[in-house]
């Protein structure tokens, strides 16, 4: 079994968004935008849309608006 750490951690992400539900909504919507052709707003080593979206949230590039 692989015990790899998720980076950034869920705790760090929740300080930026507030709750898990909002985090899921925000990252999934942003990942969908990237899948549909939107340019990534940050440089990451991954080509996975969800990983890019999570890093954008972590870097405060994409923010949750109520």
UniProtKB/Swiss-Prot annotation:
EC number of the protein: 2.7.7.6
Transcription is among the record's keywords: yes
Organism superkingdom: Bacteria
A Pfam cross-reference name: RNA_pol_Rpb6
Catalytic activity, reaction form: RNA(n) + a ribonucleoside 5'-triphosphate = RNA(n+1) + diphosphate
InterPro entries in the cross-refs: DNA-dir_RNA_pol_omega, Pol_omega/Rpo6/RPB6, RPB6/omega-like_sf
SUPFAM superfamilies: RPB6/omega subunit-like
Gene3D superfamilies (UniProt xref): 3.90.940.10
Any GO CC annotation of this UniProt entry: DNA-directed RNA polymerase complex
Alphabetically ordered keywords of this record: DNA-directed RNA polymerase, Nucleotidyltransferase, Transcription, Transferase
Amino-acid biosynthesis as UniProt keyword: no
Function: Promotes RNA polymerase assembly. Latches the N- and C-terminal regions of the beta' subunit thereby facilitating its interaction with the beta and alpha subunits.
Family: Belongs to the RNA polymerase subunit omega family.
Name of the protein this chain belongs to: DNA-directed RNA polymerase subunit omega
Organism name: Clostridium botulinum (strain Eklund 17B / Type B)
Gene field: rpoZ
């Amino acid at each position: 079994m692989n015990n790899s750490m998720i980076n950034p951690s869920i705790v760090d992400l929740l300080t930026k968004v507030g709750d898990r539900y909002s985090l899921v909504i925000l990252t999934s919507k942003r990942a969908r935008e990237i899948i549909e052709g939107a340019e990534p707003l940050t440089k990451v080593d991954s080509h996975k849309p969800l990983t890019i979206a999570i890093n954008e949230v972590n870097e405060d590039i994409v923010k949750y608006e109520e």
